[in-house]
Amino acid sequence: AGKTTFLKHVALRGVSSDLSRVPIFIGLKQLSDSGLSVFDFIVNEFDVCNFPDATAYLDQLLKAGRAILLFDGLDEVNVADDERRRLTADVENFTRKYNDCQRLITCRLAADDYHFQGYTYVEMADFDQVQIREFVGKWFDGDTKQRERQDLFLSELNMAESEGLREL
């Protein structure tokens, strides 16, 4: 339904419209697999990019409420061994500690048995056929070759065997 794309859009819009807030994208499956706390996972991501003194910078940024925390894919976290419940508690504790930061969490409806206090729940509607054509048109915006790719993509999308792709 475009949850990850939506979060990336929020991150890009946040950066372009408000330079005082730093978007931080956190894949919850990757966080879960790492075994790290939310804070240590984010620090690790900054360290991978050779960000100097990431721990102090992030602590200051988060305490000042200058981050947009984008948690993606709660439904992708393993339910076995109570991992999703542990991760949910960790995310709740983290966001409670840094309560001044804006935050979003995405999850498929199938995993809606986890509710976070202080969050507003919204459901993303699926695109209709007109919206799909408009989106694809903007995606492939360009010269004649791009229009040919757009037409090919739309024709393949409408094929019976592409039902799974259409559901995305």
Predicted regions and their residues:
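P-loop NTPase signaling cores
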Residues: 1-168
